[in-house]
C-alpha cells in the first residue's frame, strides 16, 4: 500500500458536518485494510482568494496508507460532494506522523498565551 497526504476544504456553512465526513472517510480507509497516520482538523480559515464567492473554508488534513482503489473512491466522493470546495491528494514516499506546521504554530501560540497569562497573574499579586 502507498502513503498519501489528503487535504480537503469544506464549505463554511457545512462545518458542523465535518466530523461525520472525517469519520466516513477514515472508515473507508480502515475497512480496506489501510491506516490513518495523521488526522488534523485545521478548522475554519481565511482563503487566499475567493472560491465560489466564499472567503473562508473548513480545512482538514489526513495522511493515510491505503490501496489505490480507496483513494480513487475518495477522489470520486470529493468530486461529487457539493460541500467539498477543493481537494488535493498527493502520494508520499513514507508515512508522515509528526504534527504539521499549522498545528505546531497553533500550539506555540497557546503555550505563549498561557505563559503571558501566568506572568500577568503573577504581576497582579
Swiss-Prot record:
One of its GO terms (biological process) is translation. Keywords: Ribonucleoprotein, Ribosomal protein, RNA-binding, rRNA-binding. The keyword Ribonucleoprotein applies. One of its GO terms (cellular component) is cytosolic small ribosomal subunit. Transmembrane segments: none annotated. PROSITE patterns: RIBOSOMAL_S6. One of its GO terms (molecular function) is small ribosomal subunit rRNA binding. Belongs to the bacterial ribosomal protein bS6 family. Binds together with bS18 to 16S ribosomal RNA. PANTHER family: MITOCHONDRIAL 28S RIBOSOMAL PROTEIN S6, SMALL RIBOSOMAL SUBUNIT PROTEIN BS6M. This is Small ribosomal subunit protein bS6. It comes from Pasteurella multocida (strain Pm70).
